[in-house]
Amino acid sequence: MPVNEEDLKTYRRDLHKIPELALAEFKTHRYLLEKIQSWQTNFMTIRQVEELPTAMLVKFSGTDPSRTVGYRADIDALPVTEDTGLPFESTHKGVMHACGHDVHMSLALGLVQYFSEHQPKDNLIVFFQPAEESKSGGKLAVDLGIFEGEWHPDEFYGIHDQPNLPAGTLSTLAGTLFAGTAELEIDIHGQGGHAAYPHLGKDPIVISAELIMLLQTVVSRDVDPIEGGVVSLGMISGGFTNNVIPDTVHLAGTVRSMTKDGLDKMTTRIRQIVEGVALANDVKINVRLETGSYLPVENNPDLANNLLSFMEQRQDIAFEEAKPAMTGEDFGYILQHIPGVMLWLGVNDNHSLHSAKLNIDEAALLPGFNALKDFIEWRMSQGE
C-alpha cells in the first residue's frame, strides 16, 4: 500500500500528543519502534544505541549499492505549554512539539514504511535523533561513533519545517542555511549595599548597563556587515527591592553567526569586552560561552546543487531558493563530519517556531514526503 496523507497525519498527531524533552523521549521511541517493527523486512535492520537509548537507526540494504544515503529526523520537544486547542494537543503538561519535530518524524516514518515495501537501489539509513533542542544530540551521536563502519552515510539529508513558507513548498540553497550559535551567560559580582550610599559599593546594575551597551558594538563594529551576526541578551536578573543595591546581576543571551570563523571572532571579542569592563570597574565578572555543538548548517555545494537540479526538473514540486537564516540546528555538527543538505518544508502558519500556538498545515505532509522520497530514489539512480 502506498504511503498516503492519512498515514502521515496519523503519525504526526499521535506523536504530537506525546512530546518529550531532550534525552527523555521514551514514549516517542516506543511509538517509533512499534511502527517500524510492524514493517520489518529481511533487508531492514533496526539498531538501538545503548549509550543513547532514545536514538534509533533503520538501515535498508540496497539491491545494488554504490553509496549509503542518510536521512535524519529529530524527535524531542520543547518546554512550552501548548495553547492550540487542537483535539490532539499535548497530553504532557508543559511540553509541546512547538518546533515541528512531530512533522520531521512523520516524514521519516513515511520513508521507512515506503522503503520497507520498495527495496532501495542504494543503502539507506534513517536516523531518529534525540535531543536536538538542548542537549546536542547530533554531537552526541557523532562523538559516540554511531555513524562508523557499515552505519556511515556517504551523504546526509534533513528537513526542518518553516511556518513562513506555503504548505508543501521546499526551500534550500547551496551554502550555509542556518547560523552557528553560542549560548552566553554572564555573572557580575559587585558589592551591594544601601541605595542611598552607592559610593560605598560597586553597583552591578550600572555595570550591567555598561556591558549590555558595549556588547551591542560586537556586531556593528567588529563583524563584516556582509557576513552579519547577532548578539542578543534575552534575560537580566538582579536585585529584589528598590532601595538596595544587589551584590550580583545575571545576564543571558545568544550569539549567532553564519560562519564558524565569525562565531569564534565574536565570542573572542565578547570575552575581551567582559574583561575590560571588569577591570574598569574593579569587579569580578564570570562569562560562560557554550560553543561547538550548534555549528553553522553548511550545505555541501555539490550535493545541494544536485538537489536543486532535481527540483528544477520537477515542475510538480513547489520550490524556492532559500535565504540564510539565523536559526540554530545541531544538524550542522553532523554536516561537519558527513556532507549533506538541509531543507525547509513550508507548513504555512501565522505563528513562529517555538510558539505555544504553532499549528502546522497538514497539507504539507504528503507533498513533503513525496518530494523527499522521489529525490532519494532519483539520487540513487545516478550511480557513483
From Swiss-Prot:
The keyword Hydrolase applies. GO terms for biological process: diaminopimelate biosynthetic process; lysine biosynthetic process via diaminopimelate. It comes from the Bacteria. Its EC number is 3.5.1.47. Disulfide bonds: none annotated. GO terms for molecular function: N-acetyldiaminopimelate deacetylase activity. Keywords: Amino-acid biosynthesis, Diaminopimelate biosynthesis, Hydrolase, Lysine biosynthesis. Catalyzes the conversion of N-acetyl-diaminopimelate to diaminopimelate and acetate. NCBIfam families: amidohydrolases. Belongs to the peptidase M20A family. N-acetyldiaminopimelate deacetylase subfamily. This is N-acetyldiaminopimelate deacetylase. It comes from Leuconostoc mesenteroides subsp. mesenteroides (strain ATCC 8293 / DSM 20343 / BCRC 11652 / CCM 1803 / JCM 6124 / NCDO 523 / NBRC 100496 / NCIMB 8023 / NCTC 12954 / NRRL B-1118 / 37Y).
